[in-house]
Amino acid sequence: MLFGLVSRHYVEFSQDTLISGGKFKGCTASAGQIACVEAQADGAYLLPVWRGEMHLTDEIGAYHPFADWETAEPGDIIGGFTTFYGKQQGHGKAAAREHNISEGVKRIDGVAVEREETFSFNALCAPYRHSNDYELAPNVSTDGFGYGGGVCQVTTTLYNAALTLPLQIEEWALHSKQGAVYVPQFFDAAVGNYSDFTFVNLLPYGVQIHASAQNGVLTVLFCRAEEDSQ
Protein backbone atom coordinates (compact mmCIF):
# COMPACT_ATOMS: atom_id res chain seq x y z
CA MET A 1 0.00 0.00 0.00
CA LEU A 2 1.29 3.43 -0.92
CA PHE A 3 0.51 6.26 1.45
CA GLY A 4 1.56 9.84 0.84
CA LEU A 5 4.40 10.22 3.30
CA VAL A 6 6.00 12.44 0.65
CA SER A 7 3.25 13.98 -1.48
CA ARG A 8 4.82 15.76 -4.42
CA HIS A 9 1.66 16.83 -6.25
CA TYR A 10 -1.73 18.28 -5.46
CA VAL A 11 -5.03 18.30 -7.31
CA GLU A 12 -7.50 21.17 -7.45
CA PHE A 13 -10.89 19.58 -8.01
CA SER A 14 -12.87 21.00 -10.91
CA GLN A 15 -16.05 19.12 -10.01
CA ASP A 16 -17.70 17.53 -7.01
CA THR A 17 -15.81 14.27 -6.38
CA LEU A 18 -16.73 11.37 -4.12
CA ILE A 19 -13.75 10.37 -1.96
CA SER A 20 -13.50 6.86 -0.51
CA GLY A 21 -10.81 4.34 0.36
CA GLY A 22 -9.70 1.98 3.10
CA LYS A 23 -12.42 1.86 5.76
CA PHE A 24 -13.50 5.44 5.09
CA LYS A 25 -17.19 5.58 4.18
CA GLY A 26 -16.70 8.64 2.04
CA CYS A 27 -17.11 12.38 1.61
CA THR A 28 -17.61 14.65 -1.38
CA ALA A 29 -14.92 17.19 -2.23
CA SER A 30 -16.27 20.32 -3.88
CA ALA A 31 -14.92 22.08 -6.94
CA GLY A 32 -12.06 24.35 -5.92
CA GLN A 33 -10.88 22.24 -3.00
CA ILE A 34 -7.30 20.93 -2.92
CA ALA A 35 -5.93 17.52 -1.95
CA CYS A 36 -2.36 16.22 -1.94
CA VAL A 37 -1.76 13.20 -4.16
CA GLU A 38 0.93 10.75 -5.28
CA ALA A 39 2.07 10.77 -8.92
CA GLN A 40 2.86 7.35 -10.38
CA ALA A 41 5.48 6.47 -13.01
CA ASP A 42 2.73 5.61 -15.49
CA GLY A 43 1.18 9.06 -15.16
CA ALA A 44 -1.63 7.96 -12.86
CA TYR A 45 -2.43 9.63 -9.54
CA LEU A 46 -3.24 8.01 -6.22
CA LEU A 47 -5.05 9.72 -3.36
CA PRO A 48 -4.15 8.21 0.06
CA VAL A 49 -7.37 7.64 2.04
CA TRP A 50 -7.48 6.03 5.50
CA ARG A 51 -4.64 3.53 5.06
CA GLY A 52 -6.01 2.79 1.63
CA GLU A 53 -5.93 4.62 -1.66
CA MET A 54 -8.15 5.92 -4.43
CA HIS A 55 -7.19 6.06 -8.09
CA LEU A 56 -7.97 9.46 -9.61
CA THR A 57 -8.82 10.30 -13.20
CA ASP A 58 -7.72 13.29 -15.26
CA GLU A 59 -11.30 14.53 -15.47
CA ILE A 60 -11.74 15.37 -11.80
CA GLY A 61 -9.35 18.33 -11.75
CA ALA A 62 -6.00 19.92 -12.50
CA TYR A 63 -2.82 18.34 -11.12
CA HIS A 64 0.21 20.39 -10.12
CA PRO A 65 3.65 19.43 -8.77
CA PHE A 66 4.90 21.07 -5.62
CA ALA A 67 7.73 23.50 -6.23
CA ASP A 68 11.20 22.27 -5.26
CA TRP A 69 11.97 23.98 -1.96
CA GLU A 70 15.53 24.75 -3.09
CA THR A 71 14.38 26.82 -6.08
CA ALA A 72 10.94 27.95 -4.88
CA GLU A 73 9.85 31.55 -5.33
CA PRO A 74 7.79 33.46 -2.74
CA GLY A 75 4.22 32.19 -2.80
CA ASP A 76 5.07 28.77 -4.27
CA ILE A 77 3.52 25.69 -2.67
CA ILE A 78 6.42 23.48 -1.55
CA GLY A 79 4.74 20.71 0.46
CA GLY A 80 1.51 19.46 1.93
CA PHE A 81 -0.68 16.62 3.11
CA THR A 82 -4.38 15.70 3.18
CA THR A 83 -6.50 13.57 5.50
CA PHE A 84 -10.22 12.87 5.50
CA TYR A 85 -12.89 12.89 8.21
CA GLY A 86 -16.57 12.06 8.47
CA LYS A 87 -19.56 11.17 10.60
CA GLN A 88 -18.28 7.65 11.27
CA GLN A 89 -15.66 9.14 13.61
CA GLY A 90 -18.20 11.13 15.58
CA HIS A 91 -19.85 8.49 17.80
CA GLY A 92 -22.92 10.70 17.96
CA LYS A 93 -20.89 13.91 18.20
CA ALA A 94 -19.69 14.31 14.62
CA ALA A 95 -20.70 17.97 14.51
CA ALA A 96 -18.67 18.68 17.65
CA ARG A 97 -15.62 16.88 16.26
CA GLU A 98 -15.89 18.81 12.99
CA HIS A 99 -16.21 22.05 14.95
CA ASN A 100 -12.95 21.28 16.76
CA ILE A 101 -11.20 20.45 13.49
CA SER A 102 -12.38 23.76 12.04
CA GLU A 103 -11.23 25.56 15.19
CA GLY A 104 -7.73 24.08 14.93
CA VAL A 105 -7.51 24.84 11.23
CA LYS A 106 -8.60 28.43 11.79
CA ARG A 107 -5.85 28.97 14.35
CA ILE A 108 -2.95 27.72 12.21
CA ASP A 109 -4.10 28.96 8.80
CA GLY A 110 -1.94 31.80 7.54
CA VAL A 111 0.68 31.45 10.27
CA ALA A 112 4.21 32.32 9.16
CA VAL A 113 7.24 30.49 10.54
CA GLU A 114 10.50 32.32 9.94
CA ARG A 115 13.76 30.50 9.29
CA GLU A 116 15.22 29.00 12.48
CA GLU A 117 11.95 29.79 14.30
CA THR A 118 10.19 27.12 16.36
CA PHE A 119 6.51 26.49 15.65
CA SER A 120 4.34 25.32 18.56
CA PHE A 121 0.85 23.98 17.89
CA ASN A 122 -0.23 24.47 21.49
CA ALA A 123 0.94 28.07 21.52
CA LEU A 124 -1.80 28.73 18.98
CA CYS A 125 -4.47 26.19 19.91
CA ALA A 126 -4.27 25.18 23.59
CA PRO A 127 -5.77 24.91 26.14
CA TYR A 128 -8.32 22.34 24.99
CA ARG A 129 -11.25 23.46 27.09
CA HIS A 130 -14.82 24.63 26.62
CA SER A 131 -13.72 28.11 27.68
CA ASN A 132 -11.38 28.17 24.65
CA ASP A 133 -14.22 27.45 22.19
CA TYR A 134 -13.73 23.68 21.98
CA GLU A 135 -16.55 21.16 22.21
CA LEU A 136 -16.76 17.72 23.80
CA ALA A 137 -16.02 15.14 21.10
CA PRO A 138 -14.43 11.69 20.63
CA ASN A 139 -10.72 11.43 21.31
CA VAL A 140 -8.14 8.82 22.28
CA SER A 141 -8.44 8.76 26.07
CA THR A 142 -9.63 6.53 28.89
CA ASP A 143 -13.29 7.49 28.47
CA GLY A 144 -13.06 8.22 24.74
CA PHE A 145 -14.22 11.85 24.89
CA GLY A 146 -12.66 15.19 25.65
CA TYR A 147 -12.82 18.88 24.84
CA GLY A 148 -11.01 19.48 21.57
CA GLY A 149 -11.51 15.93 20.28
CA GLY A 150 -10.61 15.99 16.58
CA VAL A 151 -7.89 18.62 16.86
CA CYS A 152 -5.27 15.86 16.67
CA GLN A 153 -6.33 15.20 13.09
CA VAL A 154 -5.23 18.76 12.32
CA THR A 155 -1.93 18.15 14.09
CA THR A 156 -1.44 14.84 12.29
CA THR A 157 -2.07 16.43 8.90
CA LEU A 158 0.36 19.23 9.72
CA TYR A 159 2.96 16.72 10.94
CA ASN A 160 2.85 14.70 7.73
CA ALA A 161 3.04 17.88 5.65
CA ALA A 162 6.11 18.91 7.66
CA LEU A 163 7.78 15.56 6.92
CA THR A 164 7.99 16.52 3.24
CA LEU A 165 10.36 19.43 4.00
CA PRO A 166 13.53 20.33 5.96
CA LEU A 167 11.55 21.05 9.10
CA GLN A 168 13.08 19.52 12.22
CA ILE A 169 10.48 17.84 14.42
CA GLU A 170 11.23 18.78 18.03
CA GLU A 171 8.23 17.54 20.00
CA TRP A 172 5.90 14.80 18.79
CA ALA A 173 3.82 12.06 20.40
CA LEU A 174 1.78 9.12 19.17
CA HIS A 175 -1.76 8.48 20.36
CA SER A 176 -1.06 4.79 20.90
CA LYS A 177 0.54 1.84 19.15
CA GLN A 178 -2.57 1.51 16.97
CA GLY A 179 -2.40 5.15 15.94
CA ALA A 180 -5.17 6.99 14.11
CA VAL A 181 -7.26 5.34 11.39
CA TYR A 182 -6.82 8.20 8.92
CA VAL A 183 -3.01 7.82 8.53
CA PRO A 184 -0.54 4.92 8.51
CA GLN A 185 0.45 3.41 11.83
CA PHE A 186 3.06 5.51 13.66
CA PHE A 187 2.37 8.61 11.55
CA ASP A 188 -0.19 10.29 13.81
CA ALA A 189 0.62 13.23 16.07
CA ALA A 190 -1.18 13.68 19.38
CA VAL A 191 -1.55 16.93 21.27
CA GLY A 192 -3.16 17.80 24.58
CA ASN A 193 -2.90 20.22 27.44
CA TYR A 194 0.37 18.52 28.43
CA SER A 195 1.73 17.38 25.06
CA ASP A 196 2.66 19.59 22.11
CA PHE A 197 3.71 19.28 18.48
CA THR A 198 6.65 21.52 17.56
CA PHE A 199 9.12 21.89 14.72
CA VAL A 200 12.00 24.17 13.75
CA ASN A 201 12.14 25.74 10.29
CA LEU A 202 15.52 24.75 8.83
CA LEU A 203 14.73 26.15 5.39
CA PRO A 204 16.75 29.18 4.24
CA TYR A 205 13.55 31.26 4.20
CA GLY A 206 10.28 31.68 6.03
CA VAL A 207 7.26 29.51 5.30
CA GLN A 208 3.55 30.09 5.63
CA ILE A 209 0.97 27.48 6.61
CA HIS A 210 -2.29 27.26 4.67
CA ALA A 211 -4.88 24.97 6.23
CA SER A 212 -8.44 24.21 5.20
CA ALA A 213 -11.18 21.82 6.32
CA GLN A 214 -14.41 21.48 4.38
CA ASN A 215 -16.68 18.63 3.31
CA GLY A 216 -14.52 16.08 5.11
CA VAL A 217 -11.30 17.15 3.35
CA LEU A 218 -8.52 18.46 5.61
CA THR A 219 -5.47 19.83 3.78
CA VAL A 220 -2.36 21.54 5.10
CA LEU A 221 0.02 23.23 2.66
CA PHE A 222 3.37 24.91 3.16
CA CYS A 223 4.28 27.87 0.94
CA ARG A 224 7.42 29.92 0.72
CA ALA A 225 6.56 33.10 2.60
CA GLU A 226 6.07 36.23 0.53
CA GLU A 227 8.45 38.22 2.72
CA ASP A 228 11.66 36.64 3.98
CA SER A 229 13.48 37.56 7.15
CA GLN A 230 17.10 38.46 6.58
Question: Could you describe each region identified by the protein language model?
Answer:
Residues 3-8, 12-19, 25, 29, ...:
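Well-ordered beta-sheet/strand-loop patches within structured domains
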